[in-house]
Amino acid sequence: MAEISAKLVQELRQKTGAGMMDCKKALIETEGNVEEAADWLRKKGISKAGAKSDRVAAEGLVDTYIQPGGQVGVLIEVNCQTDFVARNEAFKALVKNLAKQAAAADSVESLLAQQYADSPGGTVEEFIKQTIATLGENIQVRRFVNFALAEGTQGVVDSYIHTGGRVGVLVELGSQSESVATNQEFQSLARNTAMQVAACPNVEYVSVDQIPAEVAQKEKDIEMGKDDLANKPENIKEKIVQGRIEKRLKELTLIDQPYIRDQSISVEDLFKQAKTKLGEEIQVTRFVRYILGEGIEKQEISFADEVAAQMGGK
């Protein structure tokens, strides 16, 4: 076997833009022949993928997977660089498959290490590298969460995707019996609840009693420091602040929101009505909302710079 020197690896990296370990593996497979190693990387879809993997990926899709029976669900965000690639069918298919596979993962790292279901013999990470090379953009699995009903409990997991994959919600509702858990009205309630969460970006908790004390105290401190209360007597100030705090905390809770399909009732009223119809206690166990690119600082690149970068990458 030919000796694989650091110089050979560096030469192949400069030629292909692939990662160091991928270049070393390619050189081993081709007995140190740089040209053959470059072809090997191209066949594997790795060439130039490494060079693209440090670009900021703030576009993409939020998607979900619900296992048949509604006992397990996944919400996932996969990022790319442009909306153009986000609308590409190959990218959409990748995200769908990743959402399904994430049901059996507990971290992004463990998901990437799985065998990719649609590409036997290769890992998820390897297939993503191939897709990067094919589509020409950085692709990152940013985050995912999976819900599974606890053993011995009844309920359903459902989801809602809004605005073409830019907002996604995963929700779990609990019931007392299997007959209610499989009831169509109960399952429709789960879907409508997910839609409600998507429509209420300020909502973070199911009910006021779930809000941590430190969050409530922070809101109180903010209100107490407002200029319009500076000259108020302390007892009046406390009453005003208490009223504002109660209003603010309700803005953070799901059950206190007006129901989007009927503004005359609250979400809490909706669940009370459902309880009467279904004959047993039901509740929102938990929910999570993803907003595409939330918290990612996007690079501001001029059109000329973008064209130059694309030309240089070819």
Curated annotation (Swiss-Prot):
This is Elongation factor Ts. InterPro entries: EF-Ts_dimer_sf, Transl_elong_EFTs/EF1B, Transl_elong_EFTs/EF1B_dimer, Transl_elong_Ts_CS, UBA-like_sf. One of its GO terms (cellular component) is cytoplasm. Belongs to the EF-Ts family. The keyword Cytoplasm applies. Associates with the EF-Tu.GDP complex and induces the exchange of GDP to GTP. It remains bound to the aminoacyl-tRNA.EF-Tu.GTP complex up to the GTP hydrolysis stage on the ribosome. Signal peptide: none annotated. Disulfide bonds: none annotated. One of its GO terms (molecular function) is translation elongation factor activity. The keyword Cytoplasm applies. It comes from Nostoc punctiforme (strain ATCC 29133 / PCC 73102). CDD domains: UBA_EF-Ts. PANTHER family: ELONGATION FACTOR TS, POLYPROTEIN OF EF-TS, CHLOROPLASTIC. It is found in: Cytoplasm. Keywords: Cytoplasm, Elongation factor, Protein biosynthesis. Its main location: cytoplasm.
